[in-house]
Amino acid sequence: MSLWYIIVVFVFFASIFIAKNTRKTKKNLPPGPPRLPIIGNLHQLGSKPHRSMFKLSEKYGPLVYLKLGKVPSVVASTPETVKDVLKTFDKDCCSRAFLTYPARISYNLKDLAFAPYSKYWKAVRKMTVVELYTAKRVKSFRNIREEEVASFVEFIKHSASLEEIVNLNQTLVKLSGSVICRVGFGINLEGSKLENTYEEVIHGTMEVLGSFAASDYFPVIGGIIDRITGLHNKCEKVFKGTDSFFDHCIKHHLEDGGSKDDIVDLLLKVERGEIGLGEFQFTRNHTKGILLDILLAGVDTSGHTITWVMTHLIKNPRVMKKAQAEVREVIKNKDNITEEDIEGLEYLKMVVKETLRINPLVPLLTPREASKDVKIGGYNIPKKTWIHVNIWAIHRNPNVWKDPEAFIPERFMDNQIDYKGLNFELLPFGSGRRICPGIGMGMALIHLTLINLLYRFDWKLPEGMEVEDVDLEESYGLVCPKKVPLELIPVLTQWT
């Protein structure tokens, strides 16, 4: 009797297994690892999903099928598959998966980064491209960038005179914040009443958006889990703080006469109908949603990218020496460094590209959602499937890059590969309809800051530290900054 029982149980589970695999074969889904009941493949993502997904792609191929809780997902990890997602089928793959807390933080998806693809999204995207991110607009904020970088240099100079250690993670993010607040709100952040509030807003928002939200993967019980873990309450607290911060910024702008040529001024014109948005009414919450995108994208990406560049330079003395020699030869003895000076610095541009390759700030793009059934790489991708684009995997792929773990700026010497979304081997800012629109603004600050740091100062490690002690591990969240802060001592030179 017991033998028959064992046989019946075996046949039952074997039938389920065969049925599931038959259904998967008929659906022609991409290959993927076995999954557990309820949680699916969530346990395989770990604390750094971009690295875990890269390993899975090495085993299962350029397209990997995962079930993340209740969510069917696909990971694209090669230039060919990513090109299909971001270019060939961009229109069908560029909507957004609904994410609970990004939706709340962004005023119910009234921003651009997290909003689904729709007529509204297209209208606002067009407005921002035409009004906010043109070359003329980027150039109009040049004086602000140059003034803030000059102030930053004075701070570094003071630290150098005292032989003090400088925490570059902290100071560079603060520099980015100062620029963004002047460009966005017309506010000098340092010494203002909003300085502390601003830091709380940035840190709190990044923490919430970078947290694992159970409600995104488990429709009913997930919300309960988020309340138990405290994420729900944390999000509400952060949202109220962010909303209050934007209210104060807009109030400050209006009380100041509202005549400054900043981004708030532009968005208020859209609110008043002075700049058309077609059939859509642009409210104060829409203004705040767009400001949130600008604040988050501008502050962390520029500051942390410069930190990664300096990290690789201090780890590679040969590259540091070559970059400084170029900068000092081109700049010579100029008192005032301007953004025009970047034009002749070809090696520095290669250093920045190589940093963006090894340490893209967003290694795993915000998940997209297929708006209809599509076929990619010979596999069926059903409607509503989440699509994860693993930039990290492309940038570390030995079939794409020779010695991908090595920092070699010279690899860009004999090719025209750029980071503007047209070369699918290098996509630090994404591509297609969802490409980061503020590339020009961010790169202008990155290059200007680096020219000053390399021209005016030499750099050394704190006493007792060796080059081998400099850590290259990244943290994971909405962006991936250097986990251990980079602390260096600036040294005065004849160019200081």
Curated annotation (Swiss-Prot):
Keywords assigned: Heme, Iron, Membrane, Metal-binding, Monooxygenase, Oxidoreductase, Transmembrane, Transmembrane helix
Membrane topology label: Single-pass membrane protein
Record carries keyword Iron: yes
A GO MF label: oxidoreductase activity, acting on paired donors, with incorporation or reduction of molecular oxygen
Transmembrane feature ranges: 1-21
Top class in the EC scheme: oxidoreductase
Protein name per the record: Cytochrome P450 71B13
